[in-house]
């Protein structure tokens, strides 16, 4: 049976890179939704795009990894009109919620399940931003031979956004933990996996 658990690996950003993003996001500009993806560019965020994904210093993130994420200093249920200085901060959190009934961390939160007790308070009051370069997803049907072990493994696909050096993914947090929010896959993602961040 094919499990719909997704996104258990992404390439994160360093503390310095997260701090740079926070400084740019809280530069006093009003928060506005873009008309189209082309409105955002590398220059708008003034953020260095990696020259080569294979040689760049990578921060590989897996469940239980401790990494920096961007957290609001305000109650996300109330919101703010603009992201002023101090509205966002870096927090070093562990990927995955712990629970009494599951020994493994719960690292994805289905948006359709946001009203369940484990997610409810975080979804309403404690949303966060997971900033990454790209994320990986395993195919549900395709396999390949591992160069390292010689065993058959699921084919991995890397997902990015064209002309965007950083992807912002919705997350929620509590205490020292965070979880990635997922939804049904769009047309680009669906051939590989039924869910996406």
Residue ranges and their predicted role:
Residues 1-197:
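Short linear sequence motif anchored by a di-proline
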């Amino acid at each position: 049976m094919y499990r719909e658990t997704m996104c258990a690996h992404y390439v994160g950003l360093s503390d310095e890179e997260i701090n740079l993003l926070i400084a740019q996001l809280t530069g006093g500009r009003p928060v506005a939704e873009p008309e189209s993806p082309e409105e955002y560019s590398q220059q708008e965020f003034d953020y260095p795009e990696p020259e080569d994904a294979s040689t760049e210093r990578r921060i590989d993130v897996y469940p239980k990894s401790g990494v920096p994420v961007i957290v609001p200093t305000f109650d996300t249920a109330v919101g703010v009109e603009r992201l002023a200085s101090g509205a966002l901060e870096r927090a070093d959190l562990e990927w995955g919620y712990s629970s009494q009934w599951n020994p493994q961390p719960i690292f994805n939160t289905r948006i359709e399940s946001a009203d369940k007790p484990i997610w409810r308070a975080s979804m309403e009051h404690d949303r966060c931003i997971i900033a990454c370069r790209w994320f990986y997803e395993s195919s549900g049907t395709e396999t390949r031979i591992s160069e390292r072990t010689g065993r058959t493994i699921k084919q991995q696909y890397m997902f990015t956004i064209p002309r965007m050096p950083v992807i912002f993914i919705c997350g929620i947090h509590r205490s020292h933990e965070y979880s990635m929010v997922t939804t049904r896959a769009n047309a680009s993602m669906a051939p590989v996996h039924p869910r996406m961040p």
